[in-house]
Every structure is written in structure tokens, then in C-alpha cells.
Amino acid sequence: MTSSRRRFGFTLVELLVVIAIIGILIGLLLPAVQAAREAARRMQCTNNLKQLGLSAQNFHDVHNHIPPIAQNNSKFSRVSWLVMILPYVEQSAAWNEFASGGNLRLSTAGNPSSSRTDAKVDPYKAAPWEWDIACWYVSMPAKICPSDPSGADSAAQWFPGRTNYRASLGDATIASCYFGPDGKKSRGPFCVDNGGETRDFSYITDGTSNTLMFAEVPTHATTGGSDDKTLNIKTGILTGKNPQWASTCVGFQDPNDVNSFVSSVVTRPWLGRRWADGMYIYSSFNTVLPPNSVHCIYSTSDAERSIVTPGSYHSGGVNVSFCDGSVRFISETIDCGDSSANNDDYRGKGGKSPYGVWGAIGTANAGETDITL
């Protein structure tokens, strides 16, 4: 008697069908997984801005003024608002290093254990542009947006440390902090401490819920590749007398990529570098051009007037915090008014912003209280 053995298993066709189904499922699920990850990163970015806003309020409670955007006085080196709030973002150790001075210099960039005993730093005088200062390499999650792919802090000379968060100058374009009187021309809540020049919350007559405090700006990416935004800064746009320099900046924008300049433009990789430096090109932003668009500076010097535009790796807009501590997501299509307006007509003066709703939420006391976002 002949017995037959029945075999169980997939035929080649069945196996290919199963593989195809699995591939389709992965294709359907992967975007959802990526979207969930980005949502988590965006939420963390929001929390970072909330923490920075709370730290600024705590600083105000202790010192009776908003942290200066930069220091330009006999006590401090040219440090930024981020340095001043270190004790309020759980970074007292880094602040104490900066405040006490001593053996802060490193023989190996980014290696705090490589301190040099032959080169001391005076208290409060560590220079924010020097790569070999130990406290500039503090690990501070609140200064980095997790969606930014730029990687670890830079240890390059002149560019130690990075940050995604900046303080508001409003719609003013002003020269850098060590030029003294220009520090008073900020139309936002921040100003430069030129030896006693400070602002408190009473300065914000437009309302703390209507006035920006912080926003994110992508760092100059080092990864390369298709996800790498061109985040350089166009230099030398005002070699002549051209008051419409916001529209001049837009004129160099790549028509196929609003984040980039046309290839002939000379740029500098300054965005997101030197988190401890109070110079405006490193520490602040302006509400002049739409979020996620280009950046320009008056000349080839990082000390000159600049337009730094908030932007992000979040799709469609940018996270910002207001002076009341709230955080919102602002669309890159927000009303930005007239980019051809002469910025000199508003810099350091009163009057409503010519740059639409975007400019209005940048000003602190321009009589712009009826704002709808």
C-alpha cells in the first residue's frame, strides 16, 4: 500500500505575496512612526522654550529686570542672556565656574579634565568666542532643539558650543553689543546692559501675552545631505545706502528654496554658534522676514546690523515663547507686512511695526495690543 506524505509550507508565489504585504505595511507605518517621533521632538522643543521662559521670569524676580541680551560693562565679558540664566536652568556649576574664574582653560577642546594651570581666567571674564573655556561646553539640553540634526557642540576655534534658542530684538536691526548706544534701540523686551541699562516687565506695555521673548533658529548644520538647510548668513548687503535692506535680503533668496540663497551669494556659517556670546548675530532674532526664510548682515563683520530670522526643522513654522511664559507654534505664512519698509524709521523709536502681525508680536511697547494670531 502506497502512502502519500502531505507537505506543508509556502510556495514561492505565496512567499512573495507575504513579503509584499509586509512591505506595504511597513510603508504605511513608517511615516506614522516618523511623525510620532517628530511630534515628540517638537514637544521637547516646546518644553525647552517653557523652561527658558520660566528661567527668565525667575531671573526677573531675583534681579528686578529681564536678563540683558548681552553685557557691555566693566564687570562682565561680552556674554549672552543664556549665560546669565545658567543658575535658573539647573546649571549652577557652570555659572560658578564662570563667576569664580581660575583654571578654566582647556588644552583639549571639549575635554573639561584637560585644564591648564598656566593660563587663568579672571572671574566673569571668560571670553565667549574662545574655544578653550571649560564652561562653554556645559551639557544643557534646554539650549538644543532635538529636531535639529547638526550634532554635538562645535569645538572649532571661534565657535565653541551651539544653541537653537535666541532672544527677541523685535523688528529692530541694530549693531552689536559693544557699540554701546545701539543696544537701547531694541524694540523687543531685551536690551544690552551698558552699565546699568536694563528693562523690566513694566516696559512691555503691549502686554506680555502679545510680546515674543524667545524663538528657535536652526544651527548651521554640519551633517550635509538632503536634510541640511542652508543656514548661512548673507554678508555685505548694505555696502551702499539702501534703507530697504529687508527686501534686499529677500532678493538674494533662492526662488526654489526659501531657506537658501542663490549660489552666487557669499555667506558665513555663524548661525547657532557661540551660545555664550552676546553679539546679536549669535544671541538674538528679528521679526522682520517670515519664519523659515533667509538671514542677512550689513557687512562682512559679525558685529554689524543683522536680520536673523527664526526657523526650525519642524514642518511649516517655528516654536516661540511669549513674555507671559506661553509657547506657541507660529506658521511660516504669518502676515509679515511690508519687507520694503525702511527699518531706520522704526529702530529705537515708537510706532507700530511695518512688518505685519509678525513685527507686532516682536515689539514690546509700540501700542500694538490688539493682535490676533
Feature-to-residue mapping (PLM):
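N-terminal secretory signal peptides that target proteins for export/translocation
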Residues: 1-5
